[in-house]
């Protein structure tokens, strides 16, 4: 039995050598790269339904082995429907340009050591009002919940009324979320100062931050309030994912219902946003312009917009939105006198009440993409890989 799967782009993999028990039935996975680019940090998803399990076999007992090298790859199981059993197995191969590799599902010995460090992490943060914050080894983000909203509406200090996406500018690979919040609790303002790991000096306010959504009616943009509920799906070495729910909101007498399914994979500077939305056939997603001094680069036909701030707190910062080809229909450099409401917007087609896009950033101090040119090269290659996904067959 053979399945062919076209997979969307995102994530990373580390190789480890080990001994594996060979099953009597080989389950081979072939991954093909048809681009003239090396491929890494892209997540392959193997669904439990793709594998014919025999009586007594458990999906969770399998690992991924490189057929040629016999190395065991880092992998992660995900219980997507939260029923207590894994639905998907994730791994991240590395492929040369125009090449293919074979992998096998194997049962490894109990003593095999595989890196299971939780680089991709997210959680609800009740101790800091009620943020939801997420990160991988490259970047971190957060957004704001109902308590923060109510504090503003009740004129209490410390609240935030925003559905924008905040950027936490980390410059270390390890997880910083818990540490930053703990130290900020003891020393208020701690994470607004760089102590060697990075900082949060990114102003969101009511802007869209890095990829927040809006609905445009005539010449005006309408936005939701804070998220009202959340569900964490997974954290691990390859992916974190979660769901944010929002109360219905008004866009010039149009009722908008919105739910955000967000994931962030290892090795990527972009979060993936899958928005489930009713009430509109077009969604606008934006990048804050801050003081409007940045440079815009875009290729709407290819599905991306970018903003580079060369005078960002004695450093430089780039943000971007990327969508699959054909989803982005236009962009708008929207400047207004309303505080925090100036954004670079991408207009995205909603198909069957759903739209997918990616939003992220690069900070010069992280040394990941320290120049405008290197950031735009990454965006262009990300877009190319997104539109030419790795081909995966299972037999």
UniProtKB/Swiss-Prot annotation:
Pfam families: DUF4861
Topology with respect to the bilayer: Lipid-anchor
Lipid attachment, kind S-diacylglycerol cysteine: 19
Location relative to the cell: Cell outer membrane
Signal peptide: 1-18
Keywords annotated in UniProt: Cell outer membrane, Lipoprotein, Membrane, Palmitate, Signal
Organism of this sequence: Formosa agariphila (strain DSM 15362 / KCTC 12365 / LMG 23005 / KMM 3901 / M-2Alg 35-1)
Gene Ontology cellular-component terms listed: cell outer membrane
Lineage top rank: taxon: Bacteria
Function: May be involved in ulvan degradation. Ulvan is the main polysaccharide component of the Ulvales (green seaweed) cell wall. It is composed of disaccharide building blocks comprising 3-sulfated rhamnose (Rha3S) linked to D-glucuronic acid (GlcA), L-iduronic acid (IduA), or D-xylose (Xyl).
Lipid-modified residues, N-palmitoyl cysteine kind: 19
Name this protein carries in UniProt: Uncharacterized protein P7
Chief location of this protein within or outside the cell: membrane
UniProt xrefs under InterPro entries: DUF4861
